[in-house]
Structure formats: C-alpha cells, structure tokens
Amino acid sequence: MHPKIATAGADLLSVNPRERAIKAPLVTLSLVRMLGLTTALASVVIVPVKAASADTPASTTAVERKFTVNIPAQKLSSALVALSNATGTQLAYTTQLSDGLRSSAISGTMSVNAALAQILSGTGLTYQFNGNTVVLTKASANIKLGPVRVGGTLSRESATGPGVGYVAHYTTAGTKTDTPITEIPNSIYIITKQQMVDQQPQNVMQALRYTPGVYADALGTAQNGAADNQNNNGGGFLQRGFSSMQFIDGLQTNSQSAGETAFLDRIEVVNGPASVMYGQTSPGGIIGMSLKKPTETPLHEASVGFGNWGRYEATIDVSDKITKSGNVRYRLAAIGDTQGTQTKYVDYHRVGVLPSITWDIDKKTSLTLLGSYLYTPGNGTYRTGYPSHGTLLPGEYGRIARSTFLGEPDWNKTGDRTAMFEYLFTHKFNKYVSFEQTFRWEKSRKINETLSLDDQIDASNIERIPLQQNLSSKTIGMDARFVGKFNTGPVSHHWVVGSDFRKYDASFGYQFDYTGDESIINIYNPVYGGYTPCFGYTSNCKDFGGTSTFSRFQEGVYFQDQIKYKNLSILLGGRNDWVSNTNYIQSINGLNPTNGITVKNSQRPYSNQSAFTWRAGLIYNFKFGLAPYFSYSTSFVPQTGFDSHGNTFSPLTGKQYEIGLKYQIPKTDVLLTAAAYHISENHYLVTDPNNTNYSADAGKVTSEGFEVSAHANIIKNLQAVASYSYIDARYTRTNVTSSVYNPNGFLDQSGADISEKGKYVQNVPRNMFSIFLDYTPPLNILKGIGINGGIRYVGFTYSDAVNSYKAPDYLLFDIGAHYDFGATVSALKGLRAQLAISNLTNKYYITSCNTSSCYLGEGRRVYGNISYSW
C-alpha cells in the first residue's frame, strides 16, 4: 500500500515500489492553492536536496560542486532517489511526470546540473530551481510551481519501519547500521507489517511460519542439540536446526510475553551466527523485533476482532504531534483480547499498552521513550501434550480429539505479566560521527499450575503428575555505540564501535506431587475431580521440588567496518564478551522412603567465561541486480550447567560458512535470495547418563542445508512471499548412547542402547516449503475486495535422538479476504474488513514428539476484524 501525504482530497504518492515507503510530509491546503495545479497534478514527490538548477542556481558553489555517482538505467523515480541520496539534492515533481519513464545511466564525477541533464536525457522533462528546490517539469509545459511548504522531512524507506507491502529493502538487523539488504553478506528476512495484517498471527511464532530456515511450530520441544537451553521466551521455534533467541530493538529479551504482534512494526530474521553484534546467540540466528514508535505523519487506527473459540479483540494505534512544529510526537498502542482455544479449559486472555514519545531536541539530537505493560492471565498454551499412543500411533479407540483436556479444570493456571521501560537516544556530531544508545529495563513473572503426563498405563489410561512452577526475572540491558563514515580515496567505510551489557536475574521454583493412583485419567473419556493438590514437603505429601536463583552479568565490546569500493561491499567485525555467573543457588527438597522427607541445599560456585567472536563477508552488486556473497561467522552461548564433579562447562561455540545470491529483479520490486550454509556447534549438553542430576558435554552438532526465498510486490495489487528450506542437522561427534523407544509398549522404553553419533537431531524437519499471496483485483465490479492464501509444508521429524520413530509430514492451507469500504463509498474511507483462516481443511497433525508426549498442531482457526483509519 502507498503511504499517503495529506492534501485537499488528493494523495501524494510515490510511483516506484521502492519509494512507496518514503515518509510523506503533510502538505497544507494552502500549498495546493498556491500551486494552482489541476487534480491530475496533485500527486507530488519531494526528495530532499541542497542543490541548484540549470535556470536559477542558488549559488555558484552549489552548482559547481562535483559528486562521484554511478546510477544504472532504471525507472526514473528510482534514479532520482538514488541521485538525491548521492548528492543531497532536493527534488519536487508530480508523480504523473515520471510514470513509465526510464532514466539514462550516469557514471563518473560530475555536478548536480550535469547529472540531472544526463538522467533526464530523452525523457521529455527539464528542471528549474525554485527557492531551495529543484522542480521537474515537462519541457514544453513551462509549468511553474509556487513556494512549497513541507511539514516534515521526506526520506526513503525506514530501516526499522513497517516496510512496503511484503518487501523491505533496508534493515539495521545484523549490522546495527542502516544498510540495504542487498549489501549485507548473510541471510536476512523481513516480515513486514502488511504481511502480519494479512495473515493475522496472534504471536511471533505464527508470524514466522512463512520464513525460510525457521520451524515455527515446534511447541514444547526440548532440543538436545540446540544451542540455547535457557528461556526462549515461550517460543518453540528453531532456526537452521537450533533454538533461537529474541531481541527487541536490538537488545535481548527474556520476557515471557515478548513480541505482542499488535505492538510490532516488523519482525527481522537473521539466519546464522550473530554474536559479533549481539553477544550470546545461537549459531542458528536471532529473531529481531521493532516496537511501534511515534510516526512523522499522523496515524489513527482502531479495530475490533472476532473469531472461533470465542475470540473477541480490540486494538488501538494512534500517533500524532504534540507540539505545533512536530518535534515532539507521541504514539499509543493498546490491545485487549479474550478467547478460548481448541482445547477445553485452556484460554487466552491479554491486556496490554505501549505508550511512546519522541522528542527531536534539535536537528542533530533525538530521544524516544517507550513503556509497555502486558498482563496475560491465561496464555492459551497446553504444554502437557498427549501420549504418542492415540496421536502418533493409532489408539485402541482412534485418535485423541484436539479438544481433549487431560489436566484438571481446578488445577489449570498458566499466565504471565511483563513490564518494560526503554529509551533510544541518537546524536549526530557531524557528517562523520554520530552516537546511538538503547537502554531497557524489564521485569517478567510467569506462573504455571498443571498436570504433566507420565507413564501410559494401558491403551486408555495415563498417569499424571501435578506440577506448579513460578518463574520471575529482571533484566537491565544497554547498547551504546559510535557510528560514522569516512573515505580513503575511492573506498568508503561505514564503521561501528560499541559496547553493551546485560544484567539478568532469575528465580525459578518448581514442585511435583507424586499423588499416585488418583491422578490417572482416561485419555478418551476423561473424568475430572479426582485430584486434590498436596504440597508442603511433609510426610503427608509425596512432593518433590526445588528452587534456583540465578544471576548473570554479560559485557561486550565490538567493532565493525562496512567497506565499499564501487560495487563491492566487504563486512568485517569482531567482538569480545565477558560473562560472570555471579550467583547460582539451588535448593532441592525431595522424597525419602524412610522418613518421608529430605532436604538438600547446594550453592554452586560462580563461574567466569569469555569468548571472542568474529565474522567476515563480501558481496558484489552487479548492475543488473544480482549480488553473490560469501561469509564466515562465529557464535557463543555461555553455559550454566555443572558436571558431577562441580565443574562448569565451556561455552557453546558455533561457526558458519555461508554462500548465497541476492537478486533484485530490475524494474520490479521483487527480491529473490538463495543461501547454502554449513554450521557446527561444540559443547552441547545432555543429562549425564551416569548421574541424572548433572549434565555432560555431549560433543558436536552439525547443521547444513540451503534456503531459497522470494519477497515480492509483483504489481501494485499483488504481493507474495515464498520459501523452501532444507536442513540436515546431525550429532556428528558424541559418546552418548540412548535407548530405542518403543511407543507401542506403553511403559516399555528399554530397547537396546545405541550411539547417537550420525543421527539426525530430533524435531528438526529436513524439508519445509511455503508460499503466500495477496491479490486485490483491479476490476470495478470487485472494487475494494482482496483475497489471499497460502500453503505450508513441513517434512517429517525424528522424535528421539537415535531416530527410532518419527512424526509424519503435513501440508496446510491458509486463506483470507479483505474489503476496503472506501473504494466504493467515499464516506466510508478508512473502513476495512479482514478475514483470515489458517489450516483451512482442519487437518489433524503433530508438530513434534518426545519420549513422553506428542504435541498437536492448531486446528482450523478463523480470525476476522474490522478496522478504521482516520
């Protein structure tokens, strides 16, 4: 969709899809009157500048100043934006003037006058200087624009904003600099705001379903080969076979509610190691999220939603200026949601608010303050899962229904709350150096009272273990960096030098109640009410549990240089991290058959770890849009486990080789990418087979594969995303052996032990494919109506470390529609209806299994909303 510039009844639009994200300034009604243009000339593009024209130069110095430019032949509007970026020149022209026109190529060192004359050669257009603006007109028209008053600064697409349609061309993910994706030598994928609007994901996992290299439905899995065995923010997604970490505005988050989609402008996926810029990260990559912040143009939107399972939702998102000049702006996003789920007695309830304010202190200094609060008394997840006999394998009475709840309605509490404060500060000292800083404080708490599944007694009955958990955490993080540019002859440098720290404190308590026979339930005909919780560590209660208190401080220093010589871009970076686990106290309370209770308290020694990570890559941009690249990068994750002798483990260390292609198809807004990679990770941990209370270093995991993707605004009313991923993740070096699991034997898991070496990592699909399209037909009879749909395929996954059984593959279909009321009735401008249906056929499928349970995928979900923008 085109962003809009407010005028007297006419939209100011950019023609090229690359420019649709240009933030349009407000043009007052007096401007339109002063221009005296017809309605056909009311659409204006203004590109910032400082230069002169052929007719009335501002100054001799400005006219004669020379610039080195290299702009290939392309759409005229794109060439003008490139010239503006290269020279700092401000251009004003009506979009009708550039429609269908192509520019001539320019290359060399020349003045703005010479560059404009060459670009416009053969287009039938000329230019003249009007005040401080270069105005384009038809050579024969002699149309003269009056003074242009612009309320705001027009710039190209924001590197942290919502993107344009399904495509984003610029990003800060992976480099912390505003860089075109086609100049970064590694895999980065952007989920734009429009894609989220069309697909209606309720959380980040659902938003990631169409992203290459990401398995977003691995709920409830525990990956032995995954790099991150810490809190993964309630998510079950994997990147290139490794569990992932989430970052908000560049800082790692441990929030249990991270990534409320109603609060996000975009989601950025960096596949591959990213430790150089972000510290502790898995070799699979990171998930970056950008919170909504005040916009330069007013924004007002509200919506009400509905859906199956009793869903009702309301959201609001408003942004406007506070001061008359607009140097102080605010934004407020809020959500209220209540609904059931496909499983009885499992509900989702949430209220949240995200206020923010931006103060442009002066032309060089800006400060943004954000705060958020999310209260989720029911998080809608059913982590208990179901037995494999009755889901993965045919049961005596068929499959267990998705609606089946195997817990107790009176012992069923899953919820969390999170509070956060953040500020982002920037100051530009001069054209060479600027300073950027991000700070966040967040506090999160999660509670869980459920019954987890234990042994399956027979074909119909299974034993449950009552469980209660309480996790609270507090995180303080800051990232401060100097960013700058300089040239060494024909070579340009875009450098970053920075430091960040993160202080994380967590307290985790848990208790199991081994009640016995009263906790057994029939999986096909559950009867509730037979269980009464008994917790207290007394001889009357058969409970076992403990508490852990953990504190970590991490600090890192990093540097990066993006070197560019003509069409060649080279990326070099390095980082050193120091990690201190300053406090690790564990208290274990357990059963004793003699006196009924025993208590064990232990205080673990603190540990210090450090690691150096680095990366290097290069990418070459051919003039016809192709950009091949190669990169090498490393990662690390500090580990908190201890072996049976009380010794700490080495950090998880990973490295990746990646080779790929990026192709921006000329004359289109279509970005195609392909990447092949090889990742290895050392020192992953498993439970010590000789002492199950401790961990053991299992060895090395290798993941290799390739990804292809497309993000495309094919034409004005047709957008698409598509991807294919192949992942081969294996245990390549290990001394660990595991039993062959026999899911038919109910309690029998005593098969012969075999080595895990060479086996596939469990719950990692080798093949994934997806495609999603949205189309609004231009026909008058269907004016305002749009349709969309998608296909998702996930290959089979092995369910244990020795690959003795597997969960089958599945194919899902999603469809949707939307209607713009204003397209047919002008009085209803801004009113829009939306419908999104996932898993259209209501397919029964399994996302993953382990040796104790399987997890069912979501059935048919129907979401709709009505939104109004004003």
What are these language model-derived features?
Residues 263-265, 276-355, 361-365, 419, ...:
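Outer-membrane beta-barrel translocator/receptor signature
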